[in-house]
Amino acid sequence: MTDLPFSSPAVVPQESVDTDDHALRFGGIRRLYGTRAVERFRTAHVVVVGVGGVGSWTVEALARSGIGKLTLIDLDDVCVSNVNRQLHALDGTIGRPKVEVLAERCRAIQPGIEVVEDIAFATPTNLAERIPEDADHLVDAIDSVVAKAALISWCKRRK
């Protein structure tokens, strides 16, 4: 049987092998969106408010897209009742803060990521102290309708 050129790693010239860890991890993102987008993702700061059912999946998708900095805001701990819908809910994570568990997952996916863990609820009265000034984007994954409405209003006033 003849070896095909792509069947053996020895066929690839050493100088063409990319040794930059970020480039290796996020090469698929570069192929889809281009180099400028990858660099923009790498320097972006995204805040996710609420890291439960919607937020946990969002956080992982952002980390897997090469986002450089995440701020995670939530006061809840992982509960056994979260197992059916929340990414971070596993036997070994029950009882731990959700933001802490997700921060660990993000660092395992992307070792160079910066994750700010804010173990607190976002409320109408504390948004200014919770949401960082340098945030580029904000994801609303809040359960509380009152807090959600306050966050929307706060964001509209800010930008």
Over which residues does each language-model region extend?
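Glycine-rich phosphate-binding loop
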Residues: 134-159
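Glycine-rich phosphate-binding loop and adjoining beta1-alpha1-beta2 segment
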Residues: 13-14, 67-110
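Conserved SAM-binding strand-loop segment of SAM-dependent methyltransferases
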Residues: 92, 113-122
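Short glycine/serine/threonine-rich phosphate/pyrophosphate-binding segments
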Residues: 54-59, 80, 144-150
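N-terminal charged helix/coil linker that caps or initiates catalytic domains
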Residues: 1-46
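Short amphipathic alpha-helix with an adjacent loop that forms part of the alpha/beta core around
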Residues: 125-134
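Glycine-rich adenosine-cofactor-binding loop
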Residues: 42-63, 69-74
